[in-house]
Every structure is written in structure tokens, then in C-alpha cells.
Amino acid sequence: MPTINQLLRKKRIKPVARNKVPALQKQPLKRGVCVKVYTTTPKKPNSALRKVARVRLSNGFEVTAYIGGEGHNLQEHSVVLIRGGRVKDLPGVRYHILRGNLDTQGVANRKKRRSLYGTKKGK
């Protein structure tokens, strides 16, 4: 524990909280255009082909965003909405694409948790 004199000489340093989603610039959502839509493989114990897209945002940032749900209709030049939220087993993927918004269709035949996947209520 430092003495009062030591604290007068050098103040306690506060930990700097780094921004986990810098490209959003403190906004909840951001619009962007898909530059490239592709699949990639996750980190080590997992195995799959995860669907991701490289998106150029309206503020000039270019980020990699995850496309959740089964199947999608995205291709190059699709206009999408992204939100924050990383994918734990994909390094560098810190954003999610919102389903059922702009050019992105909702997940077909989805019955549960539909609001997360932009699916309309089935009859």
C-alpha cells in the first residue's frame, strides 16, 4: 500500500476501458454494403463453415460481420444493418448482421425466437 507522499507524487492509474465495437461509433446499429460474402472455419475445438460478410459501413469503416440463422440471401452489394456482438470462435468477427432488415431476409420456417431472426408470424 503506497504512502500519502507516494500518492501525491504519482496518482493511482485508472484502467482504460477499450471500446469493443469501435466501428459503430457509440450507435446501436449501422448501415453498410456487403463487399464480400464467404464462409470461414472456427477456432480449435469447433468445426463448421460459418457464414460471414465483409461490410463497408456508411461511416467508411470496413468490418467483418456474422450472418446468423440457417440460410441467407446476401451477396455482394447487399445493403445490411449491423449490430455489435462478437462470435467467440471466429477471431476478428465483432459484429452481427440483423436479419429481416433492408436487403436481408428473415430465416425461413423459424418458429422460436423469431424476433432475433426477422421471421414473420406463421399462420
From Swiss-Prot:
User: Which Pfam families does the record associate with it?
Assistant: Ribosom_S12_S23
Question: What keywords appear on the UniProt entry?
Answer: Methylation, Ribonucleoprotein, Ribosomal protein, RNA-binding, rRNA-binding, tRNA-binding
**Where, per the database record, does this protein carry 3-methylthioaspartic acid?**
89
Q: Name one GO molecular function term.
A: structural constituent of ribosome
Which is a GO BP term held by this UniProt record?
Answer: translation
| Segment forming the signal sequence | none
Q: Which InterPro entries match?
A: NA-bd_OB-fold, Ribosomal_uS12, Ribosomal_uS12_bac
Transmembrane portions of the chain: none
State the superkingdom: Bacteria
- What functional role does this protein have? With S4 and S5 plays an important role in translational accuracy.
Query: How does this polypeptide assemble, per the annotation?
Result: Part of the 30S ribosomal subunit. Contacts proteins S8 and S17. May interact with IF1 in the 30S initiation complex.
Q: Which family does it belong to?
A: Belongs to the universal ribosomal protein uS12 family.
Could you identify this protein by its name?
Small ribosomal subunit protein uS12
